Amino acid sequence: MPRPKRRFAGELTEGRTGPGGPRVAILRPQTYMNEAGRSAGPARGSYRLELDRVAVIHDEIELPFGDVRVRLGGGLGGHNGLRSLRRDLGSPDFQRVRVGVGRPPSADPEAVSAYVLGKWRQPRGEVADLIERAADETERLVLDIPR
């Protein structure tokens, strides 16, 4: 993929998945996570994408560390980034690659916030494996490959 450009309050790169493959655009919002919709909403409008063609990769504390699941739509689970995306995309019915990061021992909102915003507690190799699995699932979704 080409070097990203600054657009839509984020870093955007466009290209194909391979020779003759589908065109894709990858947007990495440069907003705070809880304002990601400010980036994704205008990008979706500019590309005139149907909502089910928008894929969001996000952390998921309701999944154990290492699990990666894909689904269309669903609840927000208290995730402020998803709330922002729903608001600015107009609906929660976008594709999601849910990356399990596990839940902290405390349910206190401040502890949960510190957990998801803090450094990884798992060994570097396990984190690299998780990122690779998330990338694989995202590629399957984009290429429409059944599981």
Where are these regions (language model features)?
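Conserved TIR/SEFIR loop-to-helix hotspot centered on a Trp-containing motif
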Residues: L76
